[in-house]
Swiss-Prot record:
GO molecular function, one term: RNA binding
Annotated PANTHER family: PSEUDOURIDYLATE SYNTHASE TRUB1 (PTHR13767:SF2), TRNA-PSEUDOURIDINE SYNTHASE (PTHR13767)
An annotated GO BP: mRNA pseudouridine synthesis
UniProt xrefs under NCBIfam families: TruB
Name assigned to this protein: tRNA pseudouridine synthase B
EC number: 5.4.99.25
Gene3D superfamilies hit by this protein: Pseudouridine synthase, PUA domain
Active-site residues, as the UniProt record annotates them: D47 (nucleophile)
EC supergroup of this enzyme: isomerase
HAMAP family for this protein: TruB_bact
Top-level taxon of origin: Bacteria
Name of the encoding gene: truB
Isomerase is among the record's keywords: yes
Length: 308
């Protein structure tokens, strides 16, 4: 009988290099078991086919997971022109094959131009978006007729990395909610031949622009070699780099952590990251135009050292 895993409180962010073939939740649970972390969450799903950066939040860091979900991201995508699939990627069943037209670099740039900026995009029917409280992919697997939602997304840049028919390599920088599978599908239709994603890798997620990622295999190896789990996590403040910062003295930090509002004309307005005098993050707050700081999310237990 396998020994029961004893979980412990860990607080911080792991920059996981997700492998292909694993769902984001399964990747999270695998990392959580290796770290023996009590609580964990990810910051937005990567398709099972995709590899690359999946920030995982543990303990008190789960309180900022939703904020990272809305961050800008960048991907490298390999697209196969001429074949459409039911999932819009290589994991799906082929639906239709069409001839790929001769395409110059100018043709590709002209075809890509309408997909840059704020655009309307229909999500894939095989996606984790929920409809009636159920993921679309569950309905699709049952063969139900689905009208996937159309949403406005922000595609900031598309760079052509290479093209040799039928394979096109792109680097895409985009905002939250953008489906690269949908981008490939719609680009294929614009070219008159259809397309799907052959491979996809997420390069970075704001604010982790140059991430030092770790694979599940490497994580397992360093833990087996005796590394302390907490030392493998980035501190919570690493995920707060894009927020205005307020440092409070000990008395006001204690009041903030008790949920009390504070007022100071010098506070920057908007959402802020609040720290105590020793640099430990106390939480997130919102400062109004009158300098009133209201607590939004409070971090607890960050100075506690977990048992090994």
């Amino acid at each position: 009988m396998k020994p029961r895993i004893v979980y412990r409180p860990l607080h911080g962010i792991l920059l996981l290099d997700k492998p292909s073939g694993l769902s984001s939740n399964n990747a999270l649970q695998a990392a959580r078991r290796l770290l023996r972390a009590e609580k964990g969450g990810h910051t937005g799903s990567l398709d099972p086919l995709a590899t690359g950066l999946l920030p995982l939040c543990f303990g008190e860091a789960t309180k900022i997971a939703g904020l990272l979900l809305g961050s800008a991201k960048a991907y490298d995508a390999e697209i196969v022109l001429g074949v459409t699939t039911d999932t819009d990627d290589a994991d799906g069943e082929s639906l239709r094959e069409r001839a790929v037209p001769d395409l110059s670099e100018a043709d590709l740039q002209a075809a890509l131009a309408p997909f840059i900026g704020r655009i309307q995009q229909q999500a894939p029917i095989y996606s984790a978006l929920k409809q009636g409280g159920e993921p679309l992919y569950a309905k699709a697997r049952r063969g139900e007729r689905i009208e996937a939602p159309v949403r406005e997304v922000d595609v900031q840049a598309i760079e052509v990395l290479g093209y040799g028919a039928p394979r096109l390599r792109l680097r895409v920088t985009c905002g939250s909610g953008t489906y690269i599978r949908s981008l490939a599908r719609d680009l294929g239709e614009a070219l008159g031949c259809g397309a799907h994603i052959a491979s996809l890798r997420r390069l970075w997620v704001e604010p982790f622009r140059a991430p030092q990622m770790i694979t599940l295999e490497a994580l397992s190896a360093v833990l087996e070699a005796g590394a302390e789990a907490q030392t493998l996590l980035l501190p919570i403040e690493a995920g707060l780099a894009d927020f205005a910062r307020i440092v409070l003295d000990q008395t006001r930090a204690a009041r903030f952590r008790m949920g009390q509002r504070l007022r100071d004309a010098a506070f920057p307005t908007g959402q802020v990251a609040v720290f105590g005098p020793d640099g430990t993050p106390s939480g997130l707050g919102l400062v109004d135009a009158d300098g009133r700081l209201s607590p939004q999310r409070l971090f607890n237990g960050l100075n506690e050292i977990p048992a090994c």
